[in-house]
């Protein structure tokens, strides 16, 4: 964080599991590291003094929300049972939705201190619209409005589909904070930047209160390289791609988007998620997703598993500003021979209707939808146990 005053670190999971996770980490720690680790974890987030946290915000998604159920099943079961008492004729889909909203509300409440102390600059928690409706503009808007009403520090996660950018523009025009997710390629990232800018202009023209408004644009970095067609197309073209080359491909997209957003005066902030401890070179582990982007006015959002890996593999790593350093020309030239990357790297590489069928988006949306169904199944079992 010392590499840029605007650099932020967020918690990529529900705040409701932080104590469980940190407690489990301490139980596994070697005795000689226990004191140091306890201080590190308290510095990241202290439930007694959340306003002093190193974490300045929170991102969640369906798989991460499902983790809350797995980590605190009896706790969530009680929430579900209480909601059934209040809504006796509810069906399983409606019960899932009110349960999800309650998890979002409680998590946001844990960061209200950060939100208020920072004068509404930090302390946002991202609540996501149902990934199963990523092409339904009206349903996404309806869900977004419900989520936004839960707490002033709830930021709405909206997918990078063609319809999603229409939703982002609308929400921005109403002064509602957004986080663009399921985003992998430059055409998506810039479509979001433009939608936010246009929506903000409408909001200002209409005198909308923007006191609690903020926008971030997420790049699901390693998901671009790992879930799509990058390696397959390279292999078919007989182009040898190393692990480092794949990481450079992801970084090239992020760095270019960052430059365009910063130089274009767009009101959004770039956020990186889906980071990996990678590459491994000459037996040494690196995390280029952290190292090569250090010095940027950006957000890094880190899930529990990634934080554990950083503690284990990167202890003592010194960071220096590298955000403005270019991708090596030989690597970029090789990558640009691959259509999957070439389209991802150019602002007009994909038309908006092509966003919905991008391989990384389809794979991620499928995974997130399956996790959502997992939450529905959980509440359905509680419903069946009560109603027979």
Language model features with spans:
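Hydrophobic faces of well-ordered beta-strands that scaffold small-molecule active sites
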Residues: 7-13, 30-39, 56-60, 123-129, ...
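Catalytic alpha/beta core domains of metabolic enzymes, predominantly
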Residues: 177-323
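Active-site-adjacent beta->alpha loops and helix N-cap segments on the catalytic face
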Residues: 135-140, 158-172, 185-196, 282-283, ...
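N-terminal capping/small domains of soluble enzymes
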Residues: 1-78, 163
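Glycine-rich tight-turn/loop motif centered on a GG-T
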Residues: 30, 73-98, 176-179, 231-247
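C-terminal extensions of enzymes
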Residues: 317-388
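Generic structural signal for well-ordered alpha-helices
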Residues: 100-112, 141-145, 168, 189, ...
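Active-site beta->alpha loop and helix N-cap motifs at the rims of alpha/beta catalytic domains
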Residues: 52-55, 62-163, 167
């Amino acid at each position: 964080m010392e590499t840029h005053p605007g650099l932020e670190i967020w918690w990529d999971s529900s705040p409701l599991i932080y104590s469980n996770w940190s407690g489990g980490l301490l139980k596994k720690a070697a005795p000689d590291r226990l004191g140091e680790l306890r201080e590190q974890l308290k510095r990241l987030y202290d439930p007694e003094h959340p306003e002093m946290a190193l974490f300045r915000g929170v991102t969640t998604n369906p798989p991460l929300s499902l983790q809350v159920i797995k980590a605190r099943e009896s706790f969530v079961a009680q929430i579900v049972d209480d909601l059934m008492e209040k809504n006796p004729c509810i069906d399983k889909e409606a019960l899932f939705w009110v349960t999800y909203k309650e998890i979002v509300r409680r998590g946001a409440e844990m960061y209200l201190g950060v939100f208020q102390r920072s004068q509404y600059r930090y302390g946002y928690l991202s609540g996501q619209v149902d990934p199963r409706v990523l092409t339904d503009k009206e349903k996404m808007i309806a869900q977004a409005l419900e989520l936004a009403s839960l707490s002033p520090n709830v930021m709405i996660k909206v997918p990078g589909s063609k319809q999603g950018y229409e939703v982002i523009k609308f929400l921005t025009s109403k002064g509602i904070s957004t986080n663009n997710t399921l985003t992998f390629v430059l055409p998506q990232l810039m479509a979001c930047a433009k939608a936010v800018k246009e929506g903000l202009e409408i909001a200002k023209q209409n005198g909308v209160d923007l006191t609690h408004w903020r926008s971030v644009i997420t790049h699901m970095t390693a998901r671009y390289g790992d879930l799509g067609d990058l390696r397959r197309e390279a292999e078919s073209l007989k182009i040898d791609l190393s692990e480092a080359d794949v990481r450079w491909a992801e970084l090239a997209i992020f760095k270019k988007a960052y430059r365009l957003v910063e130089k274009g005066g767009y009101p959004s902030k770039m956020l990186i998620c889906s980071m990996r401890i990678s590459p491994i070179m000459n037996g040494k582990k690196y995390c280029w997703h952290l190292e090569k982007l250090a010095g940027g006015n950006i957000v890094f959002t880190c899930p529990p598993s990634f934080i554990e890996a950083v503690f284990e593999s990167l202890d003592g790593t010194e960071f220096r500003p590298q955000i403005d350093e270019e991708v090596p020309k030989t690597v970029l030239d090789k990558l640009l021979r691959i259509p999957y990357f070439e389209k991802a790297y150019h602002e007009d590489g994909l038309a908006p209707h092509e966003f919905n069928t991008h391989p990384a988006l389809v794979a991620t949306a499928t995974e997130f939808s399956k996790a959502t169904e997992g939450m529905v199944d959980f509440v359905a079992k509680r419903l069946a146990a009560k109603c027979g």
